[in-house]
């Protein structure tokens, strides 16, 4: 989990993704459309991808991708992120983390 914590704390928003996952694509698109430039970790293309996926599963990510971290803290997977977006909470989290300037 150390590698996940280290990567998650490097930017205001970090998305652990798989390049072939449609939900990962949708979540990345959501953040781009909000004006956020997240760090993207494509675990299927990372040499430590299996270790990262295992660590995400231990955090409770099911499915393991997309896993979204804001301000170094695990926010959730696609369902949670979409819920936060729809109820307006996601923008608040992004502002607090310094990822969004509006």
UniProtKB/Swiss-Prot annotation:
One of its GO terms (molecular function) is metal ion binding. Keywords: 2Fe-2S, Cytoplasm, Iron, Iron-sulfur, Metal-binding, Nucleus, Redox-active center. The keyword Metal-binding applies. [2Fe-2S] cluster binds at residue 21. Residues 1-101 form the Glutaredoxin domain. Its main location: cytoplasm. It is found in: Cytoplasm; Nucleus. PROSITE patterns: GLUTAREDOXIN_2. May only reduce GSH-thiol disulfides, but not protein disulfides. This is Monothiol glutaredoxin-S10. It comes from Arabidopsis thaliana (Mouse-ear cress). The lineage of its organism: Eukaryota, Viridiplantae, Streptophyta, Embryophyta, Tracheophyta.
